[in-house]
Amino acid sequence: MKKHVISAGLLSLSLVASIFAHDLFLKTDSFFLKPNSKFTVRVMNGTFLESEGAVTFARLSDVSVVSGGNRVHPKEADLSKDETTAFLNLTTGAAGTYVIGLSTKSREIALKAADFNEYLKEDGLPDTLEERRKTGELEEDAKERYAKHVKA
């Protein structure tokens, strides 16, 4: 019984930690919008609760709004920002379901060997960590290429 309680506690902590991970989120004040109305989507770069840095339009590889089989690409003028948060200022059309998607251009970061190995452990990539161990690469620094993709 004690093992189950400890396991449940660890699982809960890992789920909470994943919510507060550094990532990209789209947030609106409401998911129920009137037709032909203006609304703002906050582009949160950090956690779901707090944005740590505004994404610039130049950093985006794609911004799409899809509804009724049509895809629209908002322009740079539709994006505003303050120090920590970017805002997509959009207008709905006819009543229906809308999907907003956003992708950033890929970036590359250099990581020291120990930091990269820890990252692989934390992100649940044991196969990659084991491959580094088998090939004798545990002491080699690494580069990670990443991009962020989000939809709402």
Segment roles from a protein language model:
Residues M1-G9:
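Bacterial N-terminal signal peptides that target proteins for export
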Residues M1-K2, I19-A21:
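Basic/polar N-terminal segments that are highly enriched at the extreme N-terminus
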Residues H22-A152:
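N-terminal soluble domains immediately following signal/targeting peptides that reside
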Residues A8-S18:
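Bacterial N-terminal signal peptides
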